[in-house]
Amino acid sequence: MAKAVTIKIKLVSTADTGFYYVTKKNSRTMTDKMVKKKYDPVARKHVEFKEAKIK
């Protein structure tokens, strides 16, 4: 079996609310850490979410 190209990652809120999204990314084309601006329902505003490993 070949190694999977897409990997699951966790996007953790930078507002320190503990909220996170789980998404996939292509590990070959996106080698750097993913940063996205998304809605945090705990903080009730759009904040940056940074990539973290799923444990």
UniProtKB/Swiss-Prot annotation:
The superkingdom listed in its UniProt entry is: Bacteria
- The leader peptide range reads none
> Which biological process terms from the Gene Ontology are attached to this UniProt entry?
translation
Transmembrane residue ranges = none
InterPro entries from the entry? Answer: Ribosomal_bL33 (IPR001705), Ribosomal_bL33_CS (IPR018264), Ribosomal_bL33_sf (IPR038584), Ribosomal_zn-bd (IPR011332)
Which GO MF terms are attached to this record? structural constituent of ribosome
According to its UniProt record, how is this protein modified after translation?
A: The protein is methylated on either Ala-2 or Lys-3.
An example GO CC term for this entry is: cytosolic large ribosomal subunit
Keywords recorded for this protein, A-Z:
Methylation, Ribonucleoprotein, Ribosomal protein
Q: Which family does it belong to?
A: Belongs to the bacterial ribosomal protein bL33 family.
Q: Which PANTHER family match?
A: 54S RIBOSOMAL PROTEIN L39, MITOCHONDRIAL (PTHR15238), LARGE RIBOSOMAL SUBUNIT PROTEIN BL33M (PTHR15238:SF1)
This chain's protein is named: Large ribosomal subunit protein bL33
Organism whose genome encodes this protein: Rhodopseudomonas palustris (strain ATCC BAA-98 / CGA009)
Upper classification of the source organism reads: Bacteria, Pseudomonadati, Pseudomonadota, Alphaproteobacteria, Hyphomicrobiales
